[in-house]
Amino acid sequence: MKHIIILGDGMADWPVKSLGDKTLLQYAKTPYMDKLARMGRNGRLITVAEGFHPGSEVANMSVLGYNLPKVYEGRGPLEAASIGVDLQPGEMAMRCNLICVEGEILKNHSSGHISTEEADVLIQYLQEKLGNDRVRFHTGVQYRHLLVIKGGNKELDCTPPHDVPLKPFRPLMVKPLAPEAQETADLVNDLILKSQELLKNHPLNLKRMAEGKDPANSIWPWSPGYRPQMPTFSETFPQVKKGAVISAVDLINGIGYYAGLRRIAVEGATGLYNTNYENKVAAALEALKTDDFVYLHIEASGEAGHEGDIDLKLLTIENLDKRAVGPIYEAVKDWNEPVAIAVLPDHPTPCELRTHTSEPIPFLIWYPGIEPDEVQVYDEVAACNGSYGVLKEDEFIKEFMK
């Protein structure tokens, strides 16, 4: 049997008053997810272990069954792997957002979703002005980039910028968690302030402001770590001889790198509502012909949650159903070799909160011949009655892959 996970980033949500106190999954029209829930089995999964921040790296590693206390090193090293940066012993990687600050306020975490092409100009400029034998900047995708510090100490208290929109930024700057990390914290904070001086009058930002766009006028490094020691997916599940990951997000591709899943680049995959679902689905179906496992990650609903845009998030959920889940199910349901499908988010990203939370997420599993439970629709409430109950750690992936 082949296996595909279809993951709608941040798709779970809280009840919304304007939607009659329904969650977005309850309110959205999702006939295919409802059908698979009805024909399959359902449950909830704890993707954020106690003591961990509800970051996407934590949640997606949990979905894949990784033992977080053993292997977690932060998201910086995962994103480094995704963009081809091979961390050496003693090198610390940090995710480095290009953010927009307005006065003393952190306006948004994405500089108005700056394009990769524009961001590359700014990151190369920062490397030229601030880079040295110890500090390196690397361009990633859109607002998501990388800072590498040789000899950096990862014992740092860093605030993810998407957690604190419209908050004063200075109290949120990096703090050491141990005395030996003070020098690294001071270095990172100095880089933040110097970046603001360098970027505020950069021609690209002046042009963006003239066009009514947010400037990318500060860096914001966070989630530090060293090169992780992770078993590959095939080492955990020997029946998987080949596997693939499809995502527009560096972080997910970095997890895939260490999991031994080949990265499939898809034209038009943006990580936003306008991503090319059709190309991603075509790539997933093509991969399933030769591979045993495919991890199809679609970011759009998570970004809509960060924007607090209820209508946009509803659209992304319905698009996931109509343009990804439906076509994949219709394509594989009659294959000679059966295909198991799982649908789930990695974590909730409630529009009300505009950031991630740690509640268990709803999941469904379907494959030809599975004995269905009593659940009739796919959403956070219905999943509470699923036959799997509440799973944790590697219980979901073991159940799915058996």
Regions found by a protein language model. Name each.
Residues M1-K402:
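Feature captures the catalytic ectodomains and active-site-proximal regions of enzymes
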